[in-house]
Amino acid sequence: MANHKSTQKSIRQDQKRNLINKSRKSNVKTFLKRVTLAINAGDKKVASEALSAAHSKLAKAANKGIYKLNTVSRKVSRLSRKIKQLEDKI
């Protein structure tokens, strides 16, 4: 247990932030899963729309410091490449 009021407060703040960050990360993962499911189903239009929504969520998460910018870029790039491969197959 923390001995100082300031450390007690910082522990409370950390716990609060941890819950918020978990929620935001979960929300982003849900959007990424929608893109992946659309890609696996072979539906290019739905996948593109889902990617645009997921990209927005990822950018906001990066802005909040939940994900690093390179991580977001990598995720978007990989999903975009998979959608592009769907176009090539058709």
UniProtKB/Swiss-Prot annotation:
Iron-sulfur found in the keyword field: no
Q: What is this protein called?
A: Small ribosomal subunit protein bS20
Which species?
A: Orientia tsutsugamushi (strain Ikeda) (Rickettsia tsutsugamushi)
Q: Which UniProt keywords apply?
A: Ribonucleoprotein, Ribosomal protein, RNA-binding, rRNA-binding
CC annotations in GO:
small ribosomal subunit
State any single GO MF term: structural constituent of ribosome
| InterPro entries for this protein | Ribosomal_bS20 (IPR002583), Ribosomal_bS20_sf (IPR036510)
Q: Which family does it belong to?
A: Belongs to the bacterial ribosomal protein bS20 family.
What are its GO biological-process terms? translation
Q: Enumerate the residue ranges of region (Disordered).
A: 1-25
Its gene name is rpsT
